[in-house]
Amino acid sequence: QEITGFELQLVGTLTDKWFISAGYTDTDAKKTDGSPLREVPESMFSIWNNYLVTDKLALNLGVINQGESHIKDQASPKLPSFTRVDAGANYALTENTTLGLNIENLTDELYFPHSHSTHQASVGAPINAMLSISSSF
């Protein structure tokens, strides 16, 4: 098999309140006979933003895009590309305790992130939320 491609990642602070992380991967994955490898997306992109609204409240927004990938080690069928939007908020209740809310798949996109075999594809989770409290001591 032969896998070629490249990956880029940028991570940084745009302002004293805005942190961003972005990445892109482009992949060409083939078996020695030239047929594509299964479950290797042609491209992937992600970006995550964290913005500090106040000294206690932070808002988060992220986007993940995954290109088409093959279900089998053959030219077809393919898992379709998808884009998922996630969001969240964190609030510092005390210096050591944070309340968090994360919402995954904000647009309730129907997507298929991977396949389990040559004839089954997994359905991505519909819109869902998680409330958490974390504490350090």
Regions found by a protein language model. Name each.
Residues 1-73, 107, 134:
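Gram-negative outer-membrane beta-barrel transporters
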Residues 36-42, 76-80, 116-123:
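Flexible, surface-exposed loop regions and adjacent strand-edge segments
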Residues 2-4, 41-45, 81-85, 125-129:
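Residues that define the transmembrane beta-barrel architecture of outer-membrane proteins
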Residues 13-15, 52, 80, 92, ...:
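Surface-exposed coil/turn segments at beta-strand junctions on protein surfaces, enriched
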Residues 68-72, 90-137:
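C-terminal beta-signal and adjacent terminal beta-strands/loops
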Residues 2, 50, 62, 81, ...:
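A subset of signal/propeptide-processing and intrinsically disordered low-complexity segments
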